[in-house]
Amino acid sequence: MKTGERSPFLTIMLVMGLAFLYIPMILLVIYSFNNSRLVAVWGGWSTRWYVELFKSPEVWDAVILSLQVAVVNATFATVLGTLAGLAMVRFGQFKGRTLFGGMLAAPLVMPEVITGLSLLMLFITLKGIIGWPEERGATTITIAHITFSLAYVAVVIQSRLTGMGQTLEEAALDLGARPFRVLMDITLPRLAPGMVAGWLLAFTLSLDDLVIASFVTGPGSNTLPILIYSRIRTGLRPDINALATIIILAVAIGVAIAGIIMLRQQKQRERELAMAD
């Protein structure tokens, strides 16, 4: 095979992989417009399940709770994960660094069942000792999500910091700038794309979580994945397809917006570097 030629085998494998990933989603979107109550029987095009979905207060409560938890989790996880990443990359060798790195990476490899169970035991113990939390719900879910999301954000930040280098920071320090000023004016702006990526990753992980949330939630505090799972257990329903389609659309829009923002930031940095040269 000549250099630059496409391998038919690789092309076929790529097409098969994309088909395996996206055909189920396409079928889900199509059947969300099915007029029949039977999911597998086509009854014509209709938007009735979207109308019924938007009339359901249970769905709206789950959507609002999931979004609230995801936004708060992503924000706190980004702040804490950024600080942890800075500590691991920019602070050099310090006492306890290996232990800190191991503890930071633990949520990445810990089974979700174990994480959920351990957090449940923590909240039960705290309630017995100090009386908090009075009941499990949005607060406990948010805390649980932050504990594992910040580890993912820290990995993203560490990767970004490693690729950035420290030339500009060192030059600013040599010229008399204070470390805090260097952090705010040089490091964080250059780190912004990584922070945005970490925020989006934490947001997505929170919206997608079922296992951990099911351990630490209480009656009346159902997130969207818990609601979907509870409804599927009683049988697959067309309104679930409609709900899943809306989620897919929202995620696609979010990814597109984030991609546009990051692309603009990248072009702006390239223009600044070109002007500096």
Stretches with model-predicted labels:
Residues 37-72, 93, 230-237:
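Periplasmic/extracellular loop-to-transmembrane helix junction in inner-membrane transport proteins
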Residues 1-5, 72-104, 124, 259-263:
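Transmembrane-helix boundary motif in ABC transporter permease subunits
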Residues 1-27, 100:
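N-terminal signal-anchor/first transmembrane alpha helix
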Residues 2-12, 92-96, 158-173, 179-186, ...:
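C-terminal transmembrane helix and the adjacent membrane-cytosol boundary/short C-terminal tail
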Residues 13, 18-25, 153-158, 164-165, ...:
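Transmembrane alpha-helices
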Residues 2-7, 50-59, 207-261, 277:
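Interhelical loop and adjacent transmembrane-helix boundary motif
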Residues 23-57, 122, 217-219:
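Short membrane-interfacial helix/loop motifs at transmembrane-helix boundaries
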Residues 103-141, 152, 193-196:
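Generic hydrophobic transmembrane alpha-helix motif, especially the helices
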